[in-house]
Amino acid sequence: KVTLEGFSRGGLYALNWAAKNTDKIACIYIDAPVCDVFSWPGRKNAALWNDLLKEWNLTDEDMNSFKGNPIDNLEPLAKAGIPIISVCGDSDKTVPFKDNMDVVRSRYLALGGPVEVIIKPGVDHHPHSLENPEPVVDFILRHQPEYEKYLHYNVRGSLQNSFVKFEKERKGRVAFLGGSITEMNGWKNRIEKQLQQRFPYTTFEFVEAGIGSTGTTPGSFRLQNDVLSKGKIDLLFVEAAVNDHTNYFTPLEQVRGMEGEVRHALLSNPEMDIIMLHFIYDPFILMVAKKQQPDVVLNHERVANHYLIPSVNLVQEIGERMQDGEFTWEQFGGTHPLPFGHTFYAAAINHLFDSMWKGITPDSPVVAHEIPEEPLDEYSYYKGDFIDLKEAKLNKGWKYVPSWRADNKYEKRRGFADVPMLEATRPGDKLTLDFTGKAIGIFCTPGPTAGILEYSIDGAPFKKL
């Protein structure tokens, strides 16, 4: 299958040929494309209009019933699910965007076809393309059959609600909950840009709630404070396979934590779409080579199955690509990927979008997700929240610091500095807290300022933490 590229009037040729040869097309890239000959060249441009008539062997009268405009021949492409990406200047005076690609986008979406548009503000017909063509290259690469054979994602439930809200209401709030792979500049930032390409008229708010080293147990307790308190979330990404594994959480805790995040999120807003991600790190590589799945992935997948949450298994995909010699672990970038590695994470998520948004139109209904009456584990942390630090009774030595920062020369992690903190510096310092609940934890700072806590609940013998 081929990728068709059409610039300017080349867009006319590319779209028309593709509509008659859908079985031969992988994807289409069109740049400032002519999609309606009545817009360009148009009858006002007599010389070019006559060239058009000559080329098509038509008369001016014949044009009153002309059927060769791409804007009128999109249905075969949409039925075949041919992905289209377009780059256009919004100030194009030669081939006006509003009369051409904007019409294609609107009609293609209405037919359920996948389309992305990169709009260049203030740009006329020239210059074509992008100074950095990476978004187009990524789009083309991820739609090649050879690329797709490595993909491992599970389609469950629906992502219809987020699509309809983004396209119809033209407002969207997207949240990213996870550890340092989510916190860093990488897949998250690419998805933010690519969502804007898919929905160029939508105003997005992105809630970036990645904190290094945190898995689902702290995630389920900080969900309310770090994500849900920001407003109604339309699309939520959750990931924690690496940190739930490297921090030695038990299988039981892995389920309770992930279910805590997912169930709490859905109970807060049943219309919220959720996507679960599984990232790779060193210990998982050998498991893939042995055709094994990490237990933490299987445990998180139990939650995904119970709540019909789609998931993307990057452990399997990246492991297989490395086995086949496509790249090395060093080239990928390791646990915290290089930009090269993050392109694979983002591409897999985009494939899930393509699959689950296929056939959905802006007029599709928004439907609440069904939430199972019973949780997988009655002790899951789906009512998790932060307790106000001021509720603690500070006895000997403890103090409340409104904006705490470690007094040392070392690098400070976001989320562990310039935040409210209870601080004690001497052995024997004490505090007490009254609470009612099935579980409680203490969110501690890491690093050289960390200490050892001894705790007792309901008069039980003290234990070290």
Region spans (language model):
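Catalytic nucleophile-elbow at a beta strand-turn-alpha helix junction centered on a G-D-S/GDSL motif
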Residues: 171-186, 211-215, 439, 448
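Alpha-helical cap/lid subdomain in secreted, periplasmic
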Residues: 189-205, 209, 214, 218-365, ...
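Short beta-strand/loop motif that positions the catalytic acidic residue
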Residues: 86-88, 92
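Primarily recognizes the serine-hydrolase "nucleophile elbow" in alpha/beta-hydrolase
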Residues: 2-47
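Short, proline-enriched alpha-helix->beta-strand connector loops that line the catalytic pocket
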Residues: 77-84, 113
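Conserved catalytic region of serine esterases and O-acyltransferases that act on ester linkages
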Residues: 145-158, 169-170, 343-465
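Mobile cap/lid helix-loop segments that gate and shape the active-site cleft of serine hydrolases
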Residues: 33-34, 38-76
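C-terminal catalytic histidine-bearing segment of alpha/beta-hydrolase fold enzymes
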Residues: 98-147
